[in-house]
């Protein structure tokens, strides 16, 4: 029986900072307001693997956003190394060979894999320039179904696509959405965005938020406000998603 995700566990704060020292300051500033962190490529290359392991050991949930995509053997072996850190999520690009290899690397561990469908900084024009004949929504749907069939645990997708994808993949896949901006926030380099409450109402399970929290005058208060918005949205739609 699926159990409900606590509102605080639905918010994933992106530690998009250039050093472990900067990340540690932000983590201390956020304190108990945040339970789930995302570590991306910049921080990983600056020593973030050790930080991820420490956070996991301290009881925080960690999402390694590395978007693995290489020859299958490399993806499998890299995934196996990440699984040793004790983190919750790892991203892999939504190409069949990469997804299958990552699943092999995660076998026997609690690591959950999230397939990246289409980056939230892309739009239809960007896909056309890259040689894709599909629209964003068509490519997202195609990769979502492929990930479901391969056995991937969840998806990274824009909040604009959750209502399209949920009927295609069923209730058990985690839908994790970047491109989240509280009302009045700067959109930055994102093109497909939504407020936290609307994203939850649209079917997202977890929301990735960076600058609106880490760049706020009071990051802990900003995180708490987003969690409150999430809690309100969850109550309104009566979500009972998995933990």
UniProtKB/Swiss-Prot annotation:
<dbReference type="GO" id="GO:0005829">
    <property type="term" value="C:cytosol"/>
</dbReference>
<dbReference type="InterPro" id="IPR047596">
    <property type="entry name" value="OMPdecase_bac"/>
</dbReference>
<dbReference type="InterPro" id="IPR011060">
    <property type="entry name" value="RibuloseP-bd_barrel"/>
</dbReference>
<dbReference type="InterPro" id="IPR014732">
    <property type="entry name" value="OMPdecase"/>
</dbReference>
<comment type="similarity">
    <text>Belongs to the OMP decarboxylase family. Type 1 subfamily.</text>
</comment>
<feature type="binding site">
    <location>
        <position position="16"/>
    </location>
    <ligand>
        <name>substrate</name>
    </ligand>
</feature>
<keyword id="KW-0210">Decarboxylase</keyword>
<feature type="binding site">
    <location>
        <position position="120"/>
    </location>
    <ligand>
        <name>substrate</name>
    </ligand>
</feature>
<dbReference type="InterPro" id="IPR018089">
    <property type="entry name" value="OMPdecase_AS"/>
</dbReference>
<feature type="binding site">
    <location>
        <position position="38"/>
    </location>
    <ligand>
        <name>substrate</name>
    </ligand>
</feature>
<feature type="binding site">
    <location>
        <position position="181"/>
    </location>
    <ligand>
        <name>substrate</name>
    </ligand>
</feature>
<comment type="subunit">
    <text>Homodimer.</text>
</comment>
<dbReference type="GO" id="GO:0004590">
    <property type="term" value="F:orotidine-5'-phosphate decarboxylase activity"/>
</dbReference>
<dbReference type="InterPro" id="IPR013785">
    <property type="entry name" value="Aldolase_TIM"/>
</dbReference>
<feature type="active site" description="Proton donor">
    <location>
        <position position="67"/>
    </location>
</feature>
<dbReference type="GO" id="GO:0006207">
    <property type="term" value="P:'de novo' pyrimidine nucleobase biosynthetic process"/>
</dbReference>
<dbReference type="GO" id="GO:0044205">
    <property type="term" value="P:'de novo' UMP biosynthetic process"/>
</dbReference>
<keyword id="KW-0456">Lyase</keyword>
<dbReference type="InterPro" id="IPR001754">
    <property type="entry name" value="OMPdeCOase_dom"/>
</dbReference>
<comment type="pathway">
    <text>Pyrimidine metabolism; UMP biosynthesis via de novo pathway; UMP from orotate: step 2/2.</text>
</comment>
<dbReference type="Pfam" id="PF00215">
    <property type="entry name" value="OMPdecase"/>
</dbReference>
<feature type="binding site">
    <location>
        <position position="210"/>
    </location>
    <ligand>
        <name>substrate</name>
    </ligand>
</feature>
<feature type="binding site">
    <location>
        <position position="190"/>
    </location>
    <ligand>
        <name>substrate</name>
    </ligand>
</feature>
<feature type="binding site">
    <location>
        <begin position="65"/>
        <end position="74"/>
    </location>
    <ligand>
        <name>substrate</name>
    </ligand>
</feature>
<feature type="binding site">
    <location>
        <position position="211"/>
    </location>
    <ligand>
        <name>substrate</name>
    </ligand>
</feature>
<keyword id="KW-0665">Pyrimidine biosynthesis</keyword>
<protein>
    <recommendedName>
        <fullName>Orotidine 5'-phosphate decarboxylase</fullName>
        <ecNumber>4.1.1.23</ecNumber>
    </recommendedName>
</protein>
<comment type="function">
    <text>Catalyzes the decarboxylation of orotidine 5'-monophosphate (OMP) to uridine 5'-monophosphate (UMP).</text>
</comment>
